[in-house]
Amino acid sequence: MLVAMEGSVGYGIGGARVELEIGYERFKTKGIRDSGSKEDEADTVYLLAKELAYDVVTGQTDNLAAALAKTSGKDIVQFAKAVEISHSDIGKKVCKTKPNSGTNNYGKYAPETDTTAEKSDVAICGGKGGTSEGGSSEEVFKQFIEKTLKDGSQNWPTSKDKGPGARSEVKSKQNDNAKAVAKDLVDLNRDEKTIVAGLLAKTIEGGEVVEIRAVSSTSLRT
């Protein structure tokens, strides 16, 4: 099976070389004769575009954040569960809470942010704990879903804060959770982003894997 998210895939059929230019929304087929003197370009063939998957593998944080913000919280929960089941190591790199100082008082995921003197509750992905009552270790994507998003009906794409009593620096901002998740996904390494893109396509965008069979020779350029 040959899978390409972006770039160019070339393969030979008989005496001709066929090159697929693969990008967002479509690809074009090009036939090159043996002599290499002439190139014929066929009509454009459209693929079903997968916005979330594309934005992840190409590292477009702002576009990914905007696309995630339009995605339902319930779909995000399903995506997170898929990550936890198949690649929990990746989930440990997403929405990692931060300590208030040094290695103490990590943020603890909750339905709303409250980091007053007695609490370190956070509803923002990767939130920082308060000055006391914080966790002894970081919490990650799994806990963010379980304690903050729950069934997806709250805290997505924007987190909820406790209100006037909470510290001003942890006030919720529009689409803050969508932006934080997008940043963490884009910060993953190349292989991890490819895995995440596949899970996004499968769990949210209804993606399908396209197989190219009986390839006699291949070259991949990205």
Model-predicted segments: where are they?
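Long non-transmembrane domains of secretory-pathway and surface proteins
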Residues: 1-222
